[in-house]
Amino acid sequence: MSNNVEEKILHGTTTVGIKAKDGVVLCADMRASAGYFIANNNTMKIQKIDDHAGLTLAGGVADAQNIVDILRYHSNLHRVEKHGPISIHSLARLCSLIFHQNRGYPFMADILVGGYDAEGPALFNIDMFGSVEKKAYVTTGSGSPVAYGLLEEEYREDLTVEEAKKIALRAVKAAIVRNIGTGDGINIAIMDKDGFRLLTEEQKKAVIEL
């Protein structure tokens, strides 16, 4: 990856994904930046793909939104044709295929796909060239070096969703303190046996204050 392309992906944003024993947590800040200019301070970087799956976005907004639309379409199509939800692994492979087919003119995005299916919780990282990695925990964006420090210190294989969401929030908060491309609030989503749901402001406040 050239330095110029890598800079486009890494500049701004911190997203975090954690796979717990009973679900997946996705967390992201709300700042959209263009260089040193804050373009938007209320950006939703966590998107619902289906009732059981979601993703986080880092990189170019237009490219990332295009990928979200494609994944939603195919996930809905799978429900119609197969009479059931697409697996999280298949969703990640589809995302990989989209990136790989466009590698000549790559989407400037880095995606975390997570969810809960018949096999349990699953979390994947897909980069702009289509590489797929299954993850226990992962962070993307310019604040990721800071967030990784906290994740590596606190992650355990037996984490519950309740514990994971606290760690994810602390990781993004740490990035907000140290990274100028990260800020303006935090969103967090949980995917477990009860499906996809975003935490409300009251629920986030309760976790942050713990």
Curated annotation (Swiss-Prot):
It is an enzyme of class 3 (hydrolase). The active site is at 13 (nucleophile). GO terms for molecular function: endopeptidase activity; threonine-type endopeptidase activity. It comes from the Archaea. Pfam families: Proteasome. It is found in: Cytoplasm. NCBIfam families: arc_protsome_B. Component of the proteasome core, a large protease complex with broad specificity involved in protein degradation. This is Proteasome subunit beta 2.
